Amino acid sequence: SGNFWERSAAFNGCPIRRGGKIDLLYRAQSSRVLHEGETYEVSSIGHTTSVDGIHFTNHRQLIVPEEPWERFGCEDPRVTEIDGTFYIFYTALSTYPFSADGIKVAVALSKDLKTIDAKHPVTPFNAKAMTLFPEKVNGKFAAILTANTDRPPSTIGVAFFDRLEDMWSVDYWNAWYKTLADHEIKLQRNDAEHVEIGAPPLLTSAGWLLIYSHIRNYFTERKIFGIEAVLLDRNDPKNILAR
């Protein structure tokens, strides 16, 4: 790319269909630059559009590291539209060299995927790969996220909210994290596996379809990377129906 902010790489895209086109949010990685006193490849969130899902044009930066809690990078977006607002969850990096204490979830809000109306830090603990369910579950807003991604074993869990603003409540998340086991979707077959959410859940006639990354032998040099799918109960997403 001719854009310095995506010259090194563009990957981990999350598409969303809007009208007759597809908007794609993705992680962009710059060439090595001096940023916040460090020289490295800085991650930000790019945006591009397509009519056919193959050819994409109009690449531009949408989310850039500017707040203290994301000062060293913004990674891996996942977007869901609720009532006309796009909720873009991403990994916010606040430390360099990167460490678990500085790798957390943040969210950006946008009405048009052109401008960002607000940003919030979300989890006060180490986490990545959060996304909203596109519809309410039992009358509540629902999200799914991966906790302890950099302090394995990781845990994929479900969170429910009466109000969308609760998503960035520190008190809510502190209470949620204390009872993490109660929110877990048990996807690991054994303690040697690592899992992380891929895309936002899709509602089907049979339940919620969730795609996730699955790594075997995670704590060895013989890691085996894979992609798996699981079907979750429509009214109780912690309940696995098929995989």
Please give the residue ranges for each predicted region.
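Acidic-residue sensor for enzyme active/binding pockets
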Residues: 75
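Beta-rich carbohydrate-recognition and catalytic domains
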Residues: 1-72, 81-193, 202-243
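Active-site/ligand-binding surface loops and adjacent short beta/alpha elements
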Residues: 198-200
